[in-house]
């Protein structure tokens, strides 16, 4: 019998991670799973409220599950990533990253650009890149298999919009996924 009470999907640069939390309110059990792997197991926790902190993904991003009593024997479970609510973290992240998903050579590829460092990730691995200045901006070149790729960064000309990043694979523009 499982005491699964909460499941979250967290999109990081190295992929989307599934976090599951079991809370046995009668047994005092707390179990945290990340991508199906047990990270924390505590038995006989007589204090039913509190928090569990662990790390997610290749960058060891700090995550905390908060357990709060809301009434009687009802509990609320919230996830924080790097000290922010999951919602706030994802809103902030959407401003600092671009994500593209494409299918080629019979495989799916998830490409993430971290705009602050210009790091490029593909399916959980940080790629070797080469930056180049061009007439209207910059290009960050990399390869996926036998495919030549680059992310073009150009000014939008509007202060609010800032820089526009476009992924080009084999001279074809790839649409960004909505975050």
Curated annotation (Swiss-Prot):
It is found in: Cytoplasm. It comes from the Eukaryota. Its main location: cytoplasm. GO terms for cellular component: cytoplasm. Keywords: Acetylation, Apoptosis, Cytoplasm. The modification N-acetylthreonine is found at residue 2. GO terms for biological process: apoptotic process; negative regulation of extrinsic apoptotic signaling pathway via death domain receptors. Belongs to the FAIM1 family. Plays a role as an inducible effector molecule that mediates Fas resistance produced by surface Ig engagement in B cells. This is Fas apoptotic inhibitory molecule 1.
């Amino acid at each position: 019998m499982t005491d699964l009470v909460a499941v979250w999907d967290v999109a990081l640069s190295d992929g989307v991670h599934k976090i599951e939390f079991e809370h046995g309110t009668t047994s005092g059990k707390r179990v945290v799973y990340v991508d199906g792997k047990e990270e924390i197991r505590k038995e006989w926790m007589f204090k039913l409220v509190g928090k569990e902190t662990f790390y997610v993904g290749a960058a060891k991003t700090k995550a905390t599950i908060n357990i709060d009593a809301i009434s009687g024997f009802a509990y609320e479970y919230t996830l924080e990533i790097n000290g922010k609510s999951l919602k706030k973290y994802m809103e902030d992240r959407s401003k600092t990253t671009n994500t593209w998903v494409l299918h080629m050579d019979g495989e799916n590829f998830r490409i993430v650009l971290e705009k602050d460092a210009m790091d490029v990730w593909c399916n959980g691995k940080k790629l070797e890149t080469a930056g180049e200045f061009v007439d209207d901006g910059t290009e960050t070149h990399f390869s996926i298999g036998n495919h030549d790729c680059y992310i073009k960064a150009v000014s939008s000309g509007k202060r609010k919009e800032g820089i526009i990043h476009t992924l080009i694979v084999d001279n074809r523009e790839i649409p960004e996924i909505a975050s």
